């Protein structure tokens, strides 16, 4: 369950973004009925995953091609801020392909889950910019090295 400090941080990041990108698994698990900016979903599913969100668009493309498609959507802007709220599978793939420039992590030291990630491996090509602890959450930001 998302903690108040984590929820606040998510809302701040969303307010600074032009679009949100999620994977199909995240779209099936999380409610994205209303987003302040367009929502793009990378999925192989033909079923509309967020039917109540008028700003949602599904892309049946690999991550690099999906980002190009999203960039075309924002062609009038010099640079679009795309917030990726992905699970471990999509996030790892995007990091391996060097598609993530800035990485924001929330580490909850009390939580356990089925999707355990090797953090050292995940951030090996990134440089730590900041780390702030609020209660049991640790907020870290990294930049691609």
Where are these regions (language model features)?
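Enzymes that bind and transform nitrogen-containing heteroaromatic metabolites
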Residues: 1-145
